[in-house]
Amino acid sequence: MTRTDDTAAADQARFVAYCKQRKVNCMIVGLFNYLGDVKSSLPVPSYSCEHITRVDILSNGLVTLCCMDTEGKFGWGDASKESILDIYNGPRARAYRAMHRQGRRKQIPPCGTCNLFWPSFDGLSWPRRVQFGFAYAYYLLRYRPFIKHTASFPASSPSP
């Protein structure tokens, strides 16, 4: 569930109860600020994003930066014209991964405005993994951007 400013605590409780009833793990997250269009108090993390090691392909074949790039504005290539492996290892994809791994996420568009907080530790040296691990832990402790189904809801939550 994506929580917005007008999401009521009762709505979240009903969602949690609905998921528990069906024995499904759930997560409630805040709305991420991908292109700077969403009002959010969460800052852009300093560590690398999990999306830099994924491949997201739109229905038209465009390989995008991440799942948030639904129109392919930050595309890496076209899977209908070249292999996915070539695109993944291509210069644009490598440049994004390098910037993230160097701790320069905030300097590359659109990542510089995106506050998605899940990290990627792939391809990092051990010192950088430790550094980003501490940064991630601090981010979670300071901002607590998600609520797991076991947190802060009474067992007698109302049913949907």
What are the roles of these predicted feature ranges?
Residues C49-I52:
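Short, small/polar residue-rich loop motifs at catalytic or cofactor-binding pockets
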